[in-house]
Amino acid sequence: MRYIVSPQLVLQVGKGQEVERALYLTPYDYIDEKSPIYYFLRSHLNIQQPEIVKRHILLTLRMTQLKGYLGNLLDIKDDIIIYSHKNNLEYSYVDNTIFNPFVYTQKKTLLKNDSFLYNVYPGACDFLVIWVVRACDTSIPEFGSYEDVDNNIIKFETMLMEVFPQLDLDITVESKFNNIFRTNLKLTGLKKIIQRVQDLDINYKSLLSRYDEHFINMTGNHFILNDEQLNLSIWDLDGTLALSSDGDTVMINNVKLFTDLVSDIDTQMERIKGDITYKVHLATPINSRIKLDIETSFIFIETATNNILLSSDKKISIILAKNHISIKVKNHIPNIEKYFTFLVIAINAMFNSVQKSADFTKVETVYWSRICQNTKNKNRKPIIINYLDPGMKKISNNFYRSDEKEVFINDNGIMFTCMDPLGKYNKVGFLNIFHDMRKYCIPCCFLHDQSHRSTFSSCVHQIDVEKKIVSPYILNFGKVVTESKMSFLPIIFDAFLNDGMTANMEQDNKRLKETSGYHIVRCCAGDDIVRLRTTSDIIQFVNEDKNILIVNDMVYFPMNASDIGKKIHILIQEIVHEVMIVKKKESSDKIDFFPPNYKLLKDLFPKQTIQTPIQSDAGMVLTTDGFYIDGKLFNEDLSSKYVTFTKNVIASDAVAKYFSPLFKYVISEAKDRFIKTWMINIMIHMNVDPNNIIPTLEKYYPNSGRAQIN
């Protein structure tokens, strides 16, 4: 979403508090008639045409700095008083009554401060109105003062207005509020809240659960086992969690909803922690190693680490990365994270232009510096030059050659050449792996001329070359595999999947000579690279792709056995590859690929793969593949609109012993909790006779882990 910098309003008033000048400050060239500022002008002040001024008050200024700036803006050389009708600025009464120089009272103590604008005016990011009056036009001229403007502020503002049209303010904000409170709701309060949700009929999903030992949080159709015995969860209309409480604490994501629901309840609230962290994703990358060329202490304080900034009051920390910014604040200030992101983007545009290729480092998990690097006797990394030598021959629009050197010009106008002091690596070529993965033309220096290479033809002459020919050389497992390559499987899976299969290799190398069928690793078909960074990414991919995935020494299956497809994927350096069977005749270099024998892994799945009815009644059937009503799979989200009670589930010794061989494949901090989750999802519906547990388990879970696969 594109961030819009809100307009600001400066009002200069006279002796009778009449408006003499109304300055509409904006970095844009027009009035935003939908803005709250314009509505305030038109509806409350009856001003239709204010002065449009292309300037911007920095919200990071102290009151003395702000007063100097406003004097410069209005060209006033006299003492002035600044104030606001919404918040106290320079002066405030001890009881926080809003200060107004025209209605001053001596009955209350008046305090003066030099705080930062965004602290004393919390809504300033969206709505800032400042009133200015000459001190001599009030009854308290002694409260006025004159401040010289800081020229660095004016210089920065001028540069800001110059670069503003080119700023990409398309950002996405993720926030993490530590919005957990201690409360006295208890079970009685939670019951009142859920009753109010149902009485209001507001279509919010709600769930109140209480269990004897472990709380099972039902999110959609999934069970999540927690140690809480009592829990209330309410979801917004878009499915996000609005609030959750165990009666003693409450986590609030939707403040308005919570306030409405507890309006008739005497709640006691104590914030446990107040820090808020925002992660702001940027549409256009920035330079994370920021360097300021002018004095900007009125905005940021630079730290010893050049990608970390502090606000001037040191209460807001900002960590810069190429594609996102993390902002941590002590207290909630509306949209302050967007405003500071705007300032960071602006400063990057002013002082830290990003050369997309000059500082190129990696694509996905592959680093340029590791593949094209200088060593003692090899100088393979190209250098950047600023001009072409006279007399160089133009080979194409982006490639020039002379007897002494070759020059490649990338899409950003950066010129690369090779100048090996030893006179060996002086031929410009391109790295195949980057071109195969992302069609990037990343230069490197070679011993011999590269013009006959297909990647050279694509990068220099824009000739598309089909990568249909696959090299018969098989790489060791662990490297990212491109379209023209293949690699061995990891040793454990090579031995398992290729049991009984052979591949004849040429002596002294890894060139495939002949095979009637052998499992290897290939890149996935298509141009899109799938990258899985976390366990959550892996699980989501497997369930959506509905195929088996190998990650290190683990095998991931889709949740439902009937969903398992006929492909096998494998993760290498976070990138998804495909397991295939390769076939090759000794008399030909032609290589053919066939689907893998997926059943070898699928048969390891411990669940019964044939849909078997477990229990049925009145058109409702519970099977090993789901719950059906009148033949239709029931997949409605669980809700407190439908209430049921169950006894606490206890994992018997017989069940635990039966599944114990499987536990070495299960990631769990508590095996007993794992058994209970399994029991809740399946066994509780079977009405299992304690004396007949083993036969029932063998019927539905034949692969308990005891059977040895030969």
From Swiss-Prot:
Segment forming the signal sequence: none
GO biological process, one term: positive regulation of DNA-templated transcription
Entry keyword set: Activator, DNA-binding, Late protein, Transcription, Transcription regulation, Virion
Transmembrane spans: none
Localization per record: Virion
Keyword Transcription in annotation: yes
GO cellular component, one term: virion component
GO MF entries: DNA binding
Primary location recorded for the protein, binned into one broad class: virion
InterPro entries named among the record's database cross-references: Poxvirus_early-TF_lsu (IPR007532)
Assigned protein family: Belongs to the poxviridae VETF large subunit family.
Function: Acts with RNA polymerase to initiate transcription from early gene promoters. Is recruited by the RPO-associated protein of 94 kDa RAP94/OPG109 to form the early transcription complex, which also contains the core RNA polymerase. ETF heterodimer binds to early gene promoters.
Protein name: Early transcription factor 82 kDa subunit
